[in-house]
């Protein structure tokens, strides 16, 4: 019989990863895709988002708190020895390893990106514009930091969907899990190209 606390931890982990954190990532990609239209369209959309009522409270409750909770739950699961390299295939064990690594990298990236584009600009009274992002991403070190960060966040989200399906009993057999793995890795490729494409428009 499963440990009740372990059962709860895994389900909280999967929910906070898929819904608020994953939802934010997808929404972020859609919002930044205005850059494909024009710099002006990107600036207008960014200005609209920043002007939303209680935007700071919304970000705190729907973005930053869930991400922090997801990170804490992840550390708790690793500390308890959950999801070790024992019960799955060689490939899936490596996916668990990369899930942990990309989770750590994504957390650093999200924290840095949030500080750079929200906190720093807010304290300085600056606007987060197309040119602001260009000034950041034209610097090679920053570009590669964003490149690794975006791909880490995308992998963590997509591979997390596979884990979500297993955790909630949606994919229970080996065949279903193989199909799910192929689908989520396909999603990783699509979203990875999407995210890198956005970065290149700024760079």
Which residue ranges define each predicted feature?
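Membrane-embedded alpha-helical bundles that constitute the cytochrome b-like, heme-associated redox core
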Residues: 1-203
């Amino acid at each position: 019989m499963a440990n009740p606390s372990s059962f709860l931890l895994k389900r909280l982990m999967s929910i906070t990863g898929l819904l608020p954190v994953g939802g934010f990532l997808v929404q972020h990609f859609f919002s930044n895709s205005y850059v494909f239209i024009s710099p002006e369209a990107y600036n207008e959309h960014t200005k609209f988002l920043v002007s939303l009522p209680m935007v700071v409270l919304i970000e705190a409750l729907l973005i930053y708190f869930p991400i922090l909770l997801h990170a804490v739950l992840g550390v708790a699961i690793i500390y308890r020895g959950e999801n070790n390299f024992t019960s799955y295939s060689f490939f899936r064990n490596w996916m668990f390893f990369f899930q942990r690594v990309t989770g750590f990298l994504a957390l650093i990236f999200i924290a840095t990106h949030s500080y750079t584009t929200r906190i720093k600009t807010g304290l300085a009274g600056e606007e987060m514009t197309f040119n602001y992002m260009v000034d950041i991403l034209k610097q090679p070190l920053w570009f590669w930091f964003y490149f690794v960060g975006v791909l880490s966040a995308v992998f963590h989200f997509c591979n997390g969907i596979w884990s979500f399906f297993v955790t909630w009993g949606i994919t229970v057999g080996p065949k279903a899990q193989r199909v799910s793995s192929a689908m989520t890795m396909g999603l990783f490729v699509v979203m990875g190209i999407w995210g890198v494409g956005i970065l290149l428009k700024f760079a």
